[in-house]
Amino acid sequence: GRSTVAALLSAGVTRDPPEPVAPESPDTPSSAASSLTDGLTFADNGVPAQTTAPTSSKGYTVVNGVYLKNSSGTELDADALSDGSFAAQLTDDGPQVLIVHSHGSEAYTMPAGQEYTPTGSFRTDNDACNVVRVGDEIAAALSERGISVLHDRTLHDVPDYNDAYPHSLASVEDYMEKYPSLVFVLDVHRDAVSDADGNQYKLVSAEEPHAAQMSFIMGNAYDGWQE
């Protein structure tokens, strides 16, 4: 179980990554379950929705409507980023994408009647209400498109939040060693946005159907970072 994994990692013992399998649990959709919005109903969780967009492109590299905030000192070529070609190639030779969660217990504000039992500030080990569920949906969507996915559902921030990144790094290194076919590693987190008065907002796109806004954080201190 996850408590056993956490104990092993805390003791400095690495685990052997499992074989790639479709996510399975009562709270986990199968890869066949997604047309991801078909038949879903959405309850208001009481957090006001807000669409945010930069009012100026100053300080950003803009690529096809995506705003890249570049604090690295490396100049980005918008034309090269938008030409549709990538050095990374996905093949059928093995798992291609690894999804992990350094902070797997990061949770979401639930509608009335669906509240979770908290295990920390805006955190829960209930995988139906934390960021692991988001990883399930990403894995299902990629699998539908023929991309082989591994989803590590370990709560690396349980029991000790401060050890989350060393634990998740150890997991990623284990997976990379066992599955050299992996091309992308996604460490999926939940963000939180609030105004100057501390009021929380959920960020959605203005277009229908509404969709949550996402950000990708990428370092450039390694080869292939633009892929």
PLM region descriptions:
Residues G1-V185, R190-E227:
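Catalytic-site microenvironment of enzymes
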